[in-house]
Amino acid sequence: MPTITSYFCLLLAALTLTLALFIGLSKRQLI
């Protein structure tokens, strides 16, 4: 099912982006 794969890929991308943003903010506050 391409729809499920597409949805999973989008969810994974969103999770990675959120995690990267959180790490970036943490590093910025740490300095």
Curated annotation (Swiss-Prot):
GO terms for biological process: photosynthesis. Keywords: Electron transport, Membrane, Photosynthesis, Plastid, Thylakoid, Transmembrane, Transmembrane helix, Transport. GO terms for molecular function: electron transporter, transferring electrons within cytochrome b6/f complex of photosystem II activity. The keyword Membrane applies. The chain crosses the membrane at residues 4-24. It is a single-pass membrane protein. Pfam families: PetL. SUPFAM superfamilies: PetL subunit of the cytochrome b6f complex (SSF103436). It is found in: Plastid thylakoid membrane. GO terms for cellular component: cytochrome b6f complex; plastid thylakoid membrane. It comes from the Eukaryota. Belongs to the PetL family. Component of the cytochrome b6-f complex, which mediates electron transfer between photosystem II (PSII) and photosystem I (PSI), cyclic electron flow around PSI, and state transitions. PetL is important for photoautotrophic growth as well as for electron transfer efficiency and stability of the cytochrome b6-f complex. The 4 large subunits of the cytochrome b6-f complex are cytochrome b6, subunit IV (17 kDa polypeptide, PetD), cytochrome f and the Rieske protein, while the 4 small subunits are PetG, PetL, PetM and PetN. The complex functions as a dimer. HAMAP family: Cytb6_f_PetL. This is Cytochrome b6-f complex subunit 6. It comes from Cuscuta gronovii (Common dodder). The gene is petL.
